[in-house]
Each structure stands twice: as structure tokens, then as C-alpha cells.
């Protein structure tokens, strides 16, 4: 397994973790990236190539593709042409004995992955079990797998795309839902769905795959936890819960029960004590009768729709950013039922305006988030809700959806007398 010549595509957080992992196992690691600065910031590379180079390194035994590197990348295409095995950090970890020391659970889907993973870790710990989150959640799996406890792995479609090998390591997994997403990467919904389905290749048993909306195979966690979901709904006085939150918690409950028996009372207590991560329909407060909600994590049409349904009415919604290949016209039915004004911001503001032109909804374009908030505030009246739910990536103005959400909070927080 060692002394191989391994090509690592991408020198971001994941690429660096892969390079470190491989070097520690005696491999000769060659890095490829579009940035010379990024390449030289990783001292685990033995050689470095800019991805604009026409020359493909010789005698490569393995290619490791970082999630941000498309499967259409010239180096990926050339590796396929030469018959070189291509894996991601997920497959590297799943094949390593270190990962196998504890049971593992996998979570993928179009929306709700991070919330489900964090809740699952919280739930397992609440009943006295060791558990740790890793993967696409921000803790690279090749570094985090050295922790003790049940591995709860968030897995993106980028990490599963074109997986060919079967690695039966996961005790159970969930595809929470599938809706139109990342079409700028996968190009078609079929390819995106196929990528998500590859998580089944990582299961010890096909009977341990739980699925939600938009998935036609596997066991429905929504059906299996229907009565528990109703309990959560009726118990909302104890803690207000949106439907998608209840679904995420029920998915976590189904997965947790694959590795240990969770009493219903323990599950309900875990729901009560769980702090949902920020930027997900996050209530910020009220000023002059206008409520403010930060849903910066919403980068898909499905997520925006869920937010609009949750908030219900009198909404001034801020949409926009960098489109990921979505069709905003698909939002017209729910927008017309819930929204009084649309503020379209950022790189794709004109595209949004054109897509929604047949709806006759009032719409104002804004160059950036700061202007969008100003426009929304100038329109809002007591009883209205200003909802940031962009339906787009943030990269036209920000480095991440977190930075975008924090900027929104700062803009809102600059108002005096905001009531939380």
C-alpha cells in the first residue's frame, strides 16, 4: 500500500489532509492545483504541478480527487484514460484500518446533512456513547478518524461522484432527501442523484440504508418514525420545531438505533437540549414589528421552499448570489403564496428577475447584500419578516455561506433596539 506515486488534485483543506495521510504511509505525493501559492503552502507534496500544465506526471499509481475538483477536470480525464484508480478522501479513509476501529454512520442528502450529523453525535453522547463528527462537516475524515468513538460522517455528492469500488464499512447510512442541487458540478439531476446513491456501496448491509424525500430505494425513515415525528409536532410547545428539523432529528434517531437502542425519552430529551447550527432559519430578533431570519445556508431551491413554508407569510425574501444551475422559476408557486416582495441580489440578480417575471411579484434588484438589506428594510412594515434565504452559493461576494450569514447578522445587529 505504500511507496506509491500518488497524484492529489487540489491543495485545500481536504487535499492537504490527504497529502499528509499518504506521506505518513510512505507514499510519494504529487500535488496539483490552480494556485502556485496554495501548492507551496502544503509541505507534504514531493512535487507540484499547476493544473494548467499540459504535462501529466508519469508512473502514477493512484489519483486522489479533492471534492472541489470536477470529474471533468483534465487531470481526472487523463487519469481515467490511463486506467489510474481515482478516489476521494472518503474512500481513502474507508479503506484504512484506523477507520474500522469503531462503528460508523454516513449521512448525505441535498439538505439537512450538518444538522443531522451534529444531532446524531449529540444523541449518541447523551446516552453515554462516544461519537465524533467528521467529513464534509469541516473536520477532514483523514485527520478526524483518529478520534475515539462512533464515526458520524457527512458525505457530499462531490465525494461520492463516480465511485466505482464497493467498500462495505458503514453500519448504516441515510440519504436524507434529493432535490435539484449542484447542477453546475454534476450538470444533470440524474448524475447528481447517482452520486448520492453511491453511499450504498459503502454499507455493510443494503438493509441499513435509510432514505427520505426524492429517493426511490431504501427504507423510508419518514415512514418508520411517523409516530415519533407526530410526538415532536405535538410537543412543539416545549421547543418550536419546523417540519424539516423534525425530519432531520428522526433520521438521526433511525441511524442511532442501528448501533444502539435509544429510548424514546432519551431521544426527546436530546431534541430539547440540541442547539441547531447557525444560518439555518435562524431567528435574529425584531425591530419596529419586523422580524429578521438568517437562512444563509439555503443554497438550493428546495431549501428556500422549506424556509418559505416554515415562515408562512408576509415575507420579504432576499434571493441571490452565484447560481449553482438552479431554475428560480420553480419557486413561483410557493413565492406567490408566502412572499410580498422579492429582493434579488448579487451576481445572478438579473437572472432571478427574468425567471420570476411571469409571477407579477414585486421585485427589486440589489447589487450586494448590504444594499439588499437596505431595500428590504425600506419596504418592510410591522408584521413583516425579512428573510435571507438566497438559494445560491455565496462566492460572488463571500468566501462561504457562514460569512454571508454573519454579514447579514452584522447588518441587522447594527439596528438599535433589536428584540431577541
From Swiss-Prot:
Keywords: ATP-binding, Cell cycle, Cell division, Cell shape, Cell wall biogenesis/degradation, Cytoplasm, Ligase, Nucleotide-binding, Peptidoglycan synthesis. Pathway: Cell wall biogenesis; peptidoglycan biosynthesis. InterPro entries: Mur-like_cat_sf (IPR036565), Mur_ligase_C (IPR004101), Mur_ligase_C_dom_sf (IPR036615), Mur_ligase_cen (IPR013221), MurD (IPR005762). ATP binds at residues 109-115. It catalyses: UDP-N-acetyl-alpha-D-muramoyl-L-alanine + D-glutamate + ATP = UDP-N-acetyl-alpha-D-muramoyl-L-alanyl-D-glutamate + ADP + phosphate + H(+). The keyword Cytoplasm applies. GO terms for cellular component: cytoplasm. One of its GO terms (biological process) is cell wall organization. It is found in: Cytoplasm. GO terms for molecular function: ATP binding; UDP-N-acetylmuramoylalanine-D-glutamate ligase activity. Pfam families: Mur_ligase_C (PF02875), Mur_ligase_M (PF08245), MurD-like_N (PF21799). Its EC number is 6.3.2.9. Cell wall formation. Catalyzes the addition of glutamate to the nucleotide precursor UDP-N-acetylmuramoyl-L-alanine (UMA). PANTHER family: UDP-N-ACETYLMURAMOYLALANINE--D-GLUTAMATE LIGASE (PTHR43692:SF1). Belongs to the MurCDEF family. This is UDP-N-acetylmuramoylalanine--D-glutamate ligase. It comes from Chlamydia abortus (strain DSM 27085 / S26/3) (Chlamydophila abortus). The lineage of its organism: Bacteria, Pseudomonadati, Chlamydiota, Chlamydiia, Chlamydiales. The gene is murD.
Amino acid at each position: 500500500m505504500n511507496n506509491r506515486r500518488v497524484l492529489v488534485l487540489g491543495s485545500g483543506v481536504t487535499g492537504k489532509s490527504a497529502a499528509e495521510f499518504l506521506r505518513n504511509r510512505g507514499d510519494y505525493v504529487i500535488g496539483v492545483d490552480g494556485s502556485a501559492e496554495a501548492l507551496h503552502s502544503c509541505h507534504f507534496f514531493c512535487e507540484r504541478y499547476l493544473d494548467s500544465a499540459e504535462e501529466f506526471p508519469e508512473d502514477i499509481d493512484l489519483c486522489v480527487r479533492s471534492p472541489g475538483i470536477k470529474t471533468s477536470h483534465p487531470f481526472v480525464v487523463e487519469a481515467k484514460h490511463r486506467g489510474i484508480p481515482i478516489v476521494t478522501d472518503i474512500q481513502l479513509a474507508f479503506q484504512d484500518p484506523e477507520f474500522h476501529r469503531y462503528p460508523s454512520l454516513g449521512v448525505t442528502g441535498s439538505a439537512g446533512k450538518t444538522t443531522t450529523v451534529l444531532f446524531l453525535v449529540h444523541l449518541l453522547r447523551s446516552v453515554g456513547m462516544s461519537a465524533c463528527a467528521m467529513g464534509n462537516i469541516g473536520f477532514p475524515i483523514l485527520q478526524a478518524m483518529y478520534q475515539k468513538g462512533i464515526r458520524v460522517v457527512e458525505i457530499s455528492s462531490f465525494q461520492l461522484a463516480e465511485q466505482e469500488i464497493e467498500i462495505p464499512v458503514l453500519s448504516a447510512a441515510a440519504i436524507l432527501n434529493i432535490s435539484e442541487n449542484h447542477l453546475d458540478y454534476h450538470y444533470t439531476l440524474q448524475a447528481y442523484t447517482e452520486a448520492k446513491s453511491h453511499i450504498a456501496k459503502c454499507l455493510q448491509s443494503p438493509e441499513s440504508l435509510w432514505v427520505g424525500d426524492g429517493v426511490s430505494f431504501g427504507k423510508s425513515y419518514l415512514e418508520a418514525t411517523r409516530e415519533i415525528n407526530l410526538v415532536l409536532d405535538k410537543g412543539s410547545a416545549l421547543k418550536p420545531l419546523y417540519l424539516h428539523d423534525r425530519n432531520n432529528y428522526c433520521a438521526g434517531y433511525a441511524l442511532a438505533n442501528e448501533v444502539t437502542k435509544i429510548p424514546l425519552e432519551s431521544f426527546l430529551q436530546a431534541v430539547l437540549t440540541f442547539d441547531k447550527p447557525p444560518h439555518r432559519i435562524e431567528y435574529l430578533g425584531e425591530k419596529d414589528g419586523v422580524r429578521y431570519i438568517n437562512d444563509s445556508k439555503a443554497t438550493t431551491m428546495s431549501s428556500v421552499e422549506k424556509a418559505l413554508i416554515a415562515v408562512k407569510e408576509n415575507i420579504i425574501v432576499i434571493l441571490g448570489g452565484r447560481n449553482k444551475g438552479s431554475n428560480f422559476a420553480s419557486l413561483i408557486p410557493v413565492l406567490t403564496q408566502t412572499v410580498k416582495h422579492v429582493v434579488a441580489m448579487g451576481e445572478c440578480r438579473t437572472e432571478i428577475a427574468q425567471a420570476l417575471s411571469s409571477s407579477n411579484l414585486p421585485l427589486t434588484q440589489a447589487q450586494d447584500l448590504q444594499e439588499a438589506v437596505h431595500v428590504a428594510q425600506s419596504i418592510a412594515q410591522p408584521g413583516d419578516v425579512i428573510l435571507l434565504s438566497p438559494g445560491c452559493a455565496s462566492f460572488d461576494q463571500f468566501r462561504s455561506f457562514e460569512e454571508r450569514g454573519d454579514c447579514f447578522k452584522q447588518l441587522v445587529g447594527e439596528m438599535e433596539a433589536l428584540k431577541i
